[in-house]
From Swiss-Prot:
Any one GO molecular-function label of the UniProt entry: lipid binding
Domain CRAL-TRIO: 377-552
Ranges annotated as biased composition (Polar residues): 170-186
Family: Belongs to the patellin family.
Additional remarks: 'Patella' means 'small plate' in Latin.
Record gene name: PATL5
Protein's cellular compartments: Membrane; Cytoplasm
Species whose genome carries this gene: Arabidopsis thaliana (Mouse-ear cress)
Compositional bias per record (Basic and acidic residues), positions renumbered to this chain: 55-68, 82-100, 107-125, 132-150
Start-end of Pro residues biased regions: 244-254
Protein name: Patellin-5
PANTHER family: PATELLIN-1, PATELLIN-5
Length: 668
């Protein structure tokens, strides 16, 4: 078993550099590498594009049909022999000067063809194949050896010839030859299966579509609104998209080298695309894109954004009583913080000044109707203090708000909060009051902190059957979206159950990329790890894997200012932390391993070799049910080292978090 060690010298604690973590599939395109020959004839033929071939698991093979005339006439026996070989009757009608467009329009609906016409002489002869078998595609290549075409060339695709003849079963085709050299690749039109699918949509799927429409304009706030029970059942019952059954086409002739290569490439592309699509189905990203919060500095605004801000200022100046109006403690005019507030409304309306002004006016009127100023001083009790609370800040200094919906598993609390309309209204007022007080702690300074990080704990949260809770959260969500724009820096969902992920899959296609980039999801096994990516351990509550004890009845010698150190303990290894002591003092420390299931021990080793090692904590197995954070203190009477040892016997890595403090001894 390998052993790692970390040496720590007080008084400055060890610090660790923590870095911030940061639809329809495109159809395969057929690319033709042949160069387009220059136009040498006065005749300009416009070839109509044929409808696109229906998509299937195997790519339709595209074969070029090339007819190269050498003389004015072809021997009839050659054509007759060719017709016998393919069991088809082909009529070859020579024309002069121009090709008849009617023949080109007589193309099968489900075919994809490349027509190439190559002139050889000033006088052009057109040949048309008027009758082709319905389920076959014939490639006829005529290679002149002498002034007359030999029948053997049409009968057999010469193996040593540069232009072999191959027969590939695809839809019917027709070719024409004119004075002009043209290469036209037409793609068939894909049938519109979406219309058929919608017409046959089951009621459960219609419920999901209706739920999606509700989220067409998901804004900054994305609190965990509980979906309808019928919607969740629909999400769970929707089967995976059926893949078209593979169809095995008849093997192409071995002599058609270009067709075989094209088919192999197409099959490889289909296989790779299918693998990518399958991965996208089963993967649920924990982070849905990177998002960099705007600084709200005027110098960072584009010219368009700056013009919009100036126009919104002008609209406020010409309006009545704007100079006497304030919001969240910030005057709307003649204040350094005003621009930060106005930019929130502008961003919520895509920098459209008139719409932002309308939204701001509606918000001001709602605040009057809701009696926000009186609400701040209203006593609504402390029953919900464990449901929603502020604690610490993230690594970008945003205050962190925790929403713990599992508290509503308490039946008494649930009934007391949601049993009737009056109690739900009181809950709504309490939620708005809490948010207003939190916003008043923001600085609204350009380049400062004017947003909040939201952590939503969905562990043991009531399911979709709790109608009263769903109605209350939906109403709160609408108020937050309409009247508190751009106040969330990031939404972190932890302990996410399966039903919420199913619900999110329904609404996510209708959310803007900017809104989705603020969302982070983590299941129960990764919740602590995810929080520690965005929030330092000294700010993460102990119940979520950190060291913060703001809302715990714990005796702690540490505050948020005491930086913690994170160390990854590799599987089946032992990690030792050294705290070197140079003087007589008292050392206090906190240590925890996220999830524990390790052995922990502590001892003091004096520098004097004749001294005795003091066992502070005998090695013992720590489980997840033990205390979340282990706190110790030791009075040191001589120079030496305190060794904290963590032995990880498991096959998974563990996160070790610790911090310590040196307290000088009182003068005796």
């Amino acid at each position: 078993m390998s052993q790692d060690s970390a040496t720590t010298t007080p008084p400055p604690p060890l610090t660790s550099d923590v870095s911030m973590p940061s639809g329809e599939e495109d159809e395969p395109k057929h690319v033709t590498s042949e160069e387009e020959a220059p136009v040498t004839s006065e005749t300009n033929l416009k070839l109509p594009l044929m409808p696109e071939l229906e998509e299937s698991n195997h790519t339709a093979e595209v074969v070029s049909e090339k007819v190269t005339p050498e003389t004015m006439t072809l021997e009839s026996e050659g054509l007759n022999h060719a017709a016998e070989d393919s069991e088809q009757t082909h009529e070859v009608t020579p024309e002069t000067e121009t090709a008849k467009l009617e023949v080109l329009n007589h193309t099968a609906e489900d075919s994809e063809q490349t027509h190439e016409v190559t002139p050889e002489k000033e006088t052009v002869k057109s040949e048309f194949l008027n009758h082709v078998a319905e389920d076959s595609e014939q490639t006829h290549e005529v290679t002149p050896e002498t002034e007359t075409v030999k029948s053997e060339v049409l009968n057999h695709a010469a193996e040593d010839s540069e232009q072999p003849r191959g027969v590939t079963p695809t839809p019917e085709t027709e070719t024409s030859e004119a004075d002009t050299s043209l290469l036209v690749t037409s793609e068939t039109e894909e049938p519109n299966h979406a219309a058929e699918d919608y017409s046959e949509t089951e009621p459960s799927q219609k419920l999901m579509l209706e739920q999606r429409r509700k989220y067409m304009e998901v804004e900054d706030w994305t609190e965990p609104e509980l979906p309808d029970e019928a919607v969740l059942e629909a999400a769970a019952s929707v089967p995976e998209p059926k893949q078209p059954e593979p169809q095995t086409p008849p093997p192409p002739p071995s002599t058609t080298t270009s067709t075989v290569a094209s088919r192999s490439l197409a099959e490889m592309m289909n296989r790779e695309e299918a693998e990518v699509e399958e991965k996208q189905k089963i993967q649920i990203p924990r982070s849905l894109g990177s998002f960099k919060e705007e600084t709200n500095k005027i110098s960072d605004l584009s010219e368009t954004e700056l013009n919009a801000l100036q126009e919104l200022r002008h609209l406020l100046q010409v309006s009545q009583d704007s100079s006497k109006t304030s919001i969240w403690g910030v005057p709307l005019l003649k204040d350094d913080r005003t621009d930060v507030v106005l930019l929130k409304f502008l961003r919520a309306r895509d920098f459209k000044p008139q719409e932002a002004y309308s939204m701001l006016n509606k918000t001001l009127q709602w605040r009057i109707d809701f009696n926000i100023e009186e609400l701040l001083d209203e006593n609504l009790g402390d029953d919900l203090d464990k449901v929603v609370f502020m604690q610490g800040q993230d690594k970008e200094n945003h205050p962190v708000c925790y929403n713990v919906y599992g508290e509503f598993q308490n039946k008494d609390l649930y009934q007391k909060t949601f049993s009737d309309e009056e109690k739900r209204e009181r809950f709504l007022r309490w939620r708005i009051q809490f948010l207003e007080k939190s916003i008043r702690n923001l600085d609204f300074v350009a380049g400062g902190v004017s947003t909040i990080c939201q952590v939503n704990d969905l562990k043991n949260s009531p399911g979709p059957g709790k109608t009263e809770l769903r109605l209350a959260t939906k109403q709160a969500l609408h108020l937050l979206q309409d009247n508190y724009p751009e106040f969330v820096s990031k939404q972190i969902f932890i302990n996410v159950p399966w039903w919420y992920l199913a619900f999110y899959r329904i609404i996510s296609p209708f959310m803007s990329q900017r809104s989705k980039s603020k969302l982070v999801f983590a299941g129960p096994s990764r919740s602590a790890e995810t929080l520690l990516k965005y929030i330092s351990p000294e700010h993460v509550p102990v119940q979520y894997g950190g060291l913060s004890v703001d809302n715990c009845e714990c005796n702690s010698d540490f505050t948020h200012d005491d930086i913690a150190t994170e160390i990854t303990v590799k599987p089946t290894t032992k990690q030792t932390v050294e705290i070197i002591v140079y003087e007589k003092c008292t050392i206090v420390w906190e240590i925890r391993v996220v999830g524990w299931e390790v052995s922990y021990g502590a001892e003091f080793v004096p520098e004097n070799k004749e001294g005795y090692t003091v066992i502070i904590q005998k090695p013992r197995k720590m489980t997840a049910k033990n205390e979340l954070v282990v706190s110790h203190s030791f009075k040191v009477g001589e120079v030496g080292r305190i060794l904290l040892t963590v032995d990880n016997p498991t096959s998974t890595k563990k996160m070790l978090i610790y911090r310590f403090k040196v307290k000088p001894l009182a003068c005796e």
